[in-house]
Amino acid sequence: MGAEQPLGEHARRAERTYGAAADHYRRASLSFWDRFGAATVSRLGLAPGSTVLDLCCGAGGSALPAARAVGPGGNVLGIDAAASLLDLARARAADEGLAHVEFRRGDATRTGLPGGGFDAVVCVFGVFFAPDMAAFAAEMWRLTGAGGMLALTTWGPGLFEPANSVFWDSVRAVEPSLFKAFNPWDEITTAQALRDLYSRAGIADATAVAVPGRHHLDDPDRFWDIVLGSGYRATVDALSGAQREQVRERVIGRLRARKIATLRTDVVFGTAVRPVSARPQPGLAART
């Protein structure tokens, strides 16, 4: 296993939030992590023997499907800041006998890896956490080999609505200082916004497609699993125990009253192919 790289401040913040969320990450109510990770990989048409880098890999939602696709002759490297999520990913890989996937703790925005070393670079629901999204996308492009693909997947607008608004209205009622009117992913919720991000990173001819989606819960109470197993967790953990219970009761009560068990989960899939004529990046020999 490779050496861990030091984490930047944004990566440490993500580690705190998603490390805590790991205890709920594999609940059935959060099946969207695996579903959209697999959907991202399926769009790449990975060939057996390919090398794949999965940045902000979490519990393996996209790295594991990639490992299945490339087979034992290929190689997949997943990098994430949250050690507890990586532990989940390693356990899942071991259960499937996927010995050709490695999970490494580190800052996805500064891996220290040589340029052009991967047939595909993937980042699912992670690019918007970088302090400079365009710089992060450009770094991922640097790591993509000639003829390789860079896949970025982001959330579409209205994520988890109508439950999202119920949650934040409840937080504002209990502890106004923690109310958030804006989330990092709100900047790139359309196909055009994602294409613009590729362009700002110096990547030409990228494609992006918005796909509407719905996520169904067994009952409204299961939304609290999503709260504890996603980015909401940072807000919940900042509440006192009493406040946390007040927010939970408000959220669940309102969702039950409105019989809400279907959430909006629109997704935007972006891809770009690095021209075969592109020069190899420094530190990597030309491919044969």
Please place each PLM-identified region on the residue numbering.
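A short acidic, Gly/Pro-enriched loop at the edge of an enzyme's catalytic core
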Residues: T109-V121
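Conserved Class I S-adenosyl-L-methionine
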Residues: E4-T17, F32-W33, A59-G61, N183-T288
